[in-house]
């Protein structure tokens, strides 16, 4: 996982980069981080992010770099044009990666059920006394 970066939210959600995308790639409440990363290893979209080229994340799924850049455009609340690759990434997650992430989650769940996952358990969230 050299060069890869993930973000983890307090609720256990794991995101594929330094900022939150529309869909988490998994949850530490369900799986260990390595299991989540292993389940998506080789997925071209995440390989592109890891290599520092998010604009290439859709090529294997029919999104050219030009389409990705086009889908990265929006308009600010004041009506000014704005473009950011993170917007394209969010749209790609919404439109394409949802079923891929769900399939990876189902594979991890099946491995757990079959006893093939690591014997270590995810770290439980701490109970906070009020």
What are these regions (language model features)?
Residues 8-9:
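Short, acidic, Ser/Thr-enriched surface-loop or helix-capping motifs
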Residues 51, 92, 110-130:
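Short Fe-S-cluster ligation motifs
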Residues 13, 19-76:
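C-terminal accessory region of radical SAM enzymes
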Residues 32, 101-113:
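Short cysteine/histidine-rich metal-coordination sites, predominantly Zn2+-binding motifs
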Residues 61-104:
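Cysteine-cluster motifs in flexible loop/terminal segments that predominantly coordinate metals
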Residues 1-2:
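Short, small/polar residue-rich loop motifs at catalytic or cofactor-binding pockets
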Residues 15-17, 96-97:
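Short active-site-adjacent structural elements
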């Amino acid at each position: 996982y050299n060069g890869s970066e993930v973000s983890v939210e307090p609720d256990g959600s794991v995101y594929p980069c330094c900022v939150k995308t529309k869909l988490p790639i998994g949850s530490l409440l369900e799986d260990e981080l390595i299991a989540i990363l292993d389940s998506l290893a080789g997925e071209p979209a995440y390989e592109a992010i890891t290599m520092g080229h998010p604009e290439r994340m859709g090529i294997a799924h029919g999104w050219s770099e030009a389409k990705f850049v086009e889908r990265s455009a929006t308009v600010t609340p004041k009506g000014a044009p704005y473009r950011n690759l993170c917007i394209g990434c969010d749209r790609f997650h919404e439109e394409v990666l949802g079923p891929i992430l769900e399939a990876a989650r189902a594979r991890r769940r099946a491995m757990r059920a079959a006893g093939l996952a690591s014997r270590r358990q995810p770290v439980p969230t701490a109970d906070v006394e009020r």
